[in-house]
From Swiss-Prot:
Record has Transport as a keyword: no
InterPro entries: CAP_dom, CAP_sf, P14a_insect
Keyword Secreted belongs to the record: yes
Signal sequence segment: 1-22
Protein name stated in the entry: Tabinhibitin 6
SCP domain span: 66-210
Family: Belongs to the CRISP family.
Source superkingdom: Eukaryota
Tissue-by-tissue expression: Expressed in salivary glands.
Motif (Cell attachment site): 31-33
Length: 254
């Protein structure tokens, strides 16, 4: 006999996919004359060269992404790297809608398109892109690890001043990727991956959409005197973070 929660989980997944399919992204507001990445047909762009392919991210890949993001959030929340402790930073979960829109973005084979990516739930989503070019592409897990390592190296650039008043570059370099992973308004993430052949080179674009983004001049996260002091409930695995059920509004600014 299946556990009692299996039908409930299945129903929740069906509802989430049904909600994604029901959204008309062409009707969502976009600033200026920009288009929404979810509007129209999902086809590869001309920039994708030869043999473009969207690769499925398996559970082992999504688990890896979530584990790395939550590891660094937990590490920083307790005051590591000389950064202040976080009062109410929660565990990040996977979101299929963000992942679907990230996948649509990668099918353009350009990191920066300035397309809208907002949803009915996430009004100001953030986005990170990782481009890879080589003679041969590595396995998906190695691509993910390389992208995460790039963001992790920004720990040498980030500072308390940037946490208190965000800007994407510090005196020692870029902090955009790491600062987005540390935002306490980020509650969910979803990623997509497309590969293609560009002449003799193999190329890949990994895109991750986050439920919120940092705002210039605003705090990356609220500072506390102890890790998670404002959490209703702490997470059992990441003990310096709030649990996944913490009611944080990703659309609210600090």
């Amino acid at each position: 006999m299946l556990p009692y929660w299996c039908p409930l989980l299945l129903a929740a997944l069906v509802l989430q996919y049904a909600t994604i399919d029901a959204v008309n992204y062409c009707n969502l507001p976009c600033r200026g004359d920009r288009f929404h990445v979810g509007c129209g047909e999902s086809a590869f762009a001309q920039e994708c060269g030869e043999s473009p392919e969207t690769l499925d991210l398996l559970k082992e890949h999504t688990d890896e992404i979530l584990s790395k993001i939550n590891d660094v959030r937990d590490h920083v929340a307790k005051g590591s790297w000389g950064l202040p402790m976080a009062a109410r930073m929660k565990v990040v979960v996977w979101d299929e809608e963000l992942a679907r829109l990230a996948t649509r973005h990668t099918k353009g084979c350009l990191a920066e398109t300035h397309a809208c990516r907002n949803t009915e739930r996430f009004l100001f989503p953030g986005q990170l892109n990782f481009e890879y070019t080589d003679d041969k592409l590595p396995q998906t897990k190695e691509l993910i690890d390389a992208a995460i390592k790039k963001g992790h190296l920004q720990k040498h650039n980030i500072s308390r001043e940037i946490i208190e008043s965000y800007r994407d570059n510090g005196p020692d370099g870029n902090v955009e990727e790491l600062a987005l992973a540390l935002s306490d308004r980020v509650t969910a993430v979803g990623c997509g991956l497309t590969t293609w052949q560009d002449g003799a080179k193999a190329r890949a674009l990994l895109t991750c959409n986050f439920s919120s983004q940092n705002t210039w001049g605003r705090p990356v996260y609220k500072i506390g005197n102890s890790p998670g002091e404002k959490c209703i409930e702490k997470d059992e695995t990441y003990k310096n973070l709030c649990s996944a059920s913490e009611p944080i509004d990703p659309n609210e600014s600090n």
